[in-house]
């Protein structure tokens, strides 16, 4: 029977896509200290400043500055040629130019006035450096090859080699390359199927490799694209471009290995320097220089709420001036110490991203989940490096946590959810609908905050008890009293906080790939249960109650659907909504107005209602409120049923009556 088959398919469908909820952790690894070359001699466009390395230089003196748009030079490694022609074309003409173009438009730097020539790597780790030298000198000469991440640096991009037996016995060997002119940063692009690419979640990774002498700004880096992860599929475009932009930003400055080199607004080091101009404390165990507390500090939250009582919870805060200002502005919390950094994820994620719980879909959090945006906070971070002047006009709006106040920014998500429940309020942006209990789907679709996609609450059971500081529930409906400590949001990096998350699903052979974004036409199928319309003009609308499907006395309640994607348009100050196979669009005159849809499709009567959002959420120009008619939607329709079926039912009922009379 159709209802049974559809229900079984629907349940299996939800269980099957659960493992594919979007979550791609960043694969960044801080480069080893020995792989980073500092003190690359350069010339900036500030004639009144002496370049460091000359006798009259003072590495802490403020510069006379002129900033100009960042110029990034792409240099493609020969490994790119191993990609298919279609993928090569995508990488060369779309993926890299778009990712690089974003940062060139977003950032200004002190421009280079001469070609960049990079340092050669020394044979040994010992070298000489003294005032008056143009270049760092190697004690045993230079290596044949100088690499930048996965890339070999062309000899034409390199300085000659200065080798010394002692500070007074030096000679120059090798050729002085022409360098790379008209650029401020060289990005070496590779496509090696490296060991780091073996994980199915790794799309690309990047890091810086050389820093200039005057201000310590990174001037060269490598981005490696994992060949098997590259796709020209429309559904993969957003995540690929966002990931490459994210990785490039690690090379430009968002790196735990660079915090100790940050400068203030006058160009002075934030972290104390030794007589050689380097940060004073090298943490060999962790592989980076330690920074001063004016950059990052640890704060103890002494009353961190959990479902089992309050605990002390340490957090790490970026406390530089612009970052603090933007964090306070975003949450509307004037007492917030700064912006929280990630405290989970291990090497490469810990401290090198924004905290996922606090800034969920900010693109510089440690894992991609949905709708990544580069917000004012990340641009403020770049300004506080002392290397960049950001263009805040390119910042994207971060809805997560916006203007939710100090309680949201400074307390656990468990306390936020608990207090909202007591008040009878929605726990936005968190949720408490269980996605599945480990054996069956309990998923219910909702709209994302931006109303551009369907989403599911990612609250799931784990096999082991959650860490005590991340037990965010005292109890959960339908879960035994001792079971709540096993439940949390599926994104561990978000402190196990549950939130609405977009989803996707693929066939094993990758012949089909769909996700929950309303804007992609390929995500929909004509005549599906709730009569959705996917496409460029579609948005997400929520339902006041589940849809139903009826035929001949049989009824199916589509309880998993509480939202869907529908076409919309703005006309004469009014928002209109369209469903599948509708001849006309339905007007939304006011927020929370209901639109009633009734259609006969494939012999079944489909019935459902949509809730109208604020007109301003979707339309630029909205008219004044009007009197809402009592009913807006389709006229009443009879439940389909063939005459033969009706006669059969009538005969069966008569037979039952006859048996009853006889008894």
UniProtKB/Swiss-Prot annotation:
Membrane-spanning parts: none
UniProt GO molecular function: metal ion binding; metalloendopeptidase activity; peptidase activity
Class of enzymatic activity (EC top level): hydrolase
Superkingdom of this protein's organism: Eukaryota
Cofactor(s) essential for the protein: Zn(2+)
Cofactor binding: number and manner: Binds 1 zinc ion per subunit.
EC number: 3.4.24.-
InterPro entries membership: Peptidase_M8 (IPR001577)
GO cellular component annotations of the record: cytoplasm; membrane
Active-site positions on this chain: 247
Location of this chain's protein in the cell: Cytoplasm
One Pfam match: Peptidase_M8
Function recorded in the entry: Essential for the coordination of mitotic progression, and also plays a role in cell migration.
Similarity comment: Belongs to the peptidase M8 family.
Descriptive protein name: Leishmanolysin-like peptidase
Organism encoding this protein: Caenorhabditis elegans
